[in-house]
Amino acid sequence: MNNFKNLRGTVDLLPDQLIKWQNVEKIIIQQLFRSSVKEIRTPILEMTELFMRGIGEGTDVVSKEMYTFLDRGERSCTLRPEGTASVARALIQHGISTRPSQKLWYMGPMFRYERPQAGRQRQFHQLGVEFIGYESVNSDIEIITLAWDILQKLGIKELNLEINTLGDHIDRSNFQKAFLKWLEVNKNSLDLDSQRRIDKNPLRILDTKNVQTKQILKGAPRLFDFLSEKSLERYLIIKEKLKLLKIPFIENFNLVRGLDYYTHTAFEITTGTLGSQATVCGGGRYDSLISQMGGAETPAIGFAIGLERLIILCGSELEETRETDIYIVNKGIHAEILAMELSRKLRNYDLVVELDLSGASFSKQFKKANKLKSKSIIVIGDDEAVKNEFVIRLFNNDNSVNKEETISIEDNMKLEKWIKSNLILDKNL
């Protein structure tokens, strides 16, 4: 007996489940293409130092969640826990971080050692979008609206946009000094997890889920009060432009991103359709990341969407697959070759063609075609093969025959006319 099973926190995506995944991915990629965002693909495996420097050693991701190991060359390697650091590395390595501004996207598996739950696995899939070399407020607006539009296009309901500004590094440094002083006084009132964050990543305390700590934080200094005039002006312009675009938002001054490289704009999009407010998308500006990793000073902003949670949120209509256009029933040595030849020809018309490979009786093949709800059936026996022709039948919804025609395998004009008339009326061949 085979006792092998997938590891905890990993999931097999079976063919029926992947229909929904593929439909969701198709909609996302179409939206990105229409927004002139180009794909980039980076390795799943990177040097550990990349994430320590890019994400920050004090973050939960680096300190608790990474899958790290030594390879046979005694090099420390890590399965990527997120995609932005890898994109930044690729841009620096290939000398394209200094090129004119570019819009990039990636989609693929990431790895974090977390407690598995619905919509969150240890191997998970993430969509990331990065606008590299963009500094203007308008790039902040476009990245937010792009994320919003993708989620709306997928039919996600009850969307809420939360925004905040983290200021620049000077703003954050001034705030952090005041916040640390406040934490010293109030440390014992905080939950244990927040107490542990004080030395490593104090800003993450602002994002606590602990109810008691949330209440205590109401008396803490606000980062907003430490913003420079320039940072505040940028934030006010973003709010005004979102209002003009009629994109509703909520200001959340405790919203901080979990990674060290963020500056200025931070945002999350949540939904209440899962019973409580669940984050669907998170993003923000990270103007210092590329220089922090050894590249030139390069402004950038991006967002990420976890696909597992997105799939749960998407409606059942995205589970629908395209029906089989033609099922080819065939029996006999000569008929099999003709059927294979014909199936290849028909697929060039962007038709979904199922070629029966069973060699079973005609009646069994017809039953399978009916089960698949094929729009039409082609019948080829040795009698038809000798004449180099086939019979094609178009069916009604109740499986009764609508029309039937015999066509020569060499009569491309007649075949094309039949296809145009009966199967792809709305397509240009």
UniProtKB/Swiss-Prot annotation:
Taxonomic path: Bacteria, Bacillati, Cyanobacteriota, Cyanophyceae, Synechococcales
Catalyzed reactions per annotation: tRNA(His) + L-histidine + ATP = L-histidyl-tRNA(His) + AMP + diphosphate + H(+)
Transmembrane segments: none
Location of this chain's protein in the cell: Cytoplasm
Keyword Amino-acid biosynthesis found: no
GO biological process, one term: histidyl-tRNA aminoacylation
GO cellular component: cytoplasm
Protein name per UniProt: Histidine--tRNA ligase
EC class (word): ligase
Keyword list, A-Z: Aminoacyl-tRNA synthetase, ATP-binding, Cytoplasm, Ligase, Nucleotide-binding, Protein biosynthesis
GO molecular-function term, one example from the UniProt record: ATP binding
Disulfide bonds: none
Keyword Nucleotide-binding set for record: yes
Pfam families, sorted: HGTP_anticodon (PF03129), tRNA-synt_His (PF13393)
Family: Belongs to the class-II aminoacyl-tRNA synthetase family.
